[in-house]
Amino acid sequence: MTSQERIHAAIPIGTAKIWLQRLREAQSTAAHLAEAAALLVVMTLFRCLPLDWASGLGGFIGRIGGPHLGLSRRALRNLRRAMPENSEAENRRILRGMWDNLSRAIAEYPHLARIAASGSGRVEIVNGAALTGLATTPEPAIIFGSHLGNWEIGSSTVHRLMGASVLSVYRAANNPWVDRLMRRFHRTRRAVPKGAKGGRELVRQLRDGGSIALLVDQKQNDGIAVPFFG
């Protein structure tokens, strides 16, 4: 019997599985903490910069680095399927624009309250009285937003106008520490994560006469499976 076999024989299989599971959990926690720490550093940098500088820097980083990430291969593949008439150059232009927009949205995250603030000059509100009116009426309402530009600005603006009378739904980050950090920038927003529990909260909000807000393309994995992009 080799030394390795003797070690395996000395440790019960059940105990070994428990220790392996704990090791995986520790590795996952360490990775999550490292990811959250890196995000905190980046967000602190963007927060210290003027808004336009932060947005511009975020866009520059996205345009330069984003197209080289593995996700870009999937994006290009979907673009070719969705718009086969496009040239490869046009698809890559769209791809760079996508990364520019996403990176700007991330860089603007620490500035959301400032962007959505009354009198900031950054947001044009058309018929805002309709939203403020909903905040004082017992009739429930469902507010839909489009997932375009910096969609978080729309959410922040709706919550500023309606206050506690509106409840929104969001997709929680896979990393719980990152999720907690991102929610800190929305301290005044009432929101629930998508899913069964969040769905029950939304129904309760409507039954109580409140309003809910959500994006029109909120993804639910427990829906009906249909063919999409192959």
What do these predicted regions represent?
Residues 113-230:
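Soluble catalytic domains of membrane acyltransferases
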Residues 2-145, 179-184, 188:
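Membrane-anchoring hydrophobic helices of lipid-metabolizing enzymes
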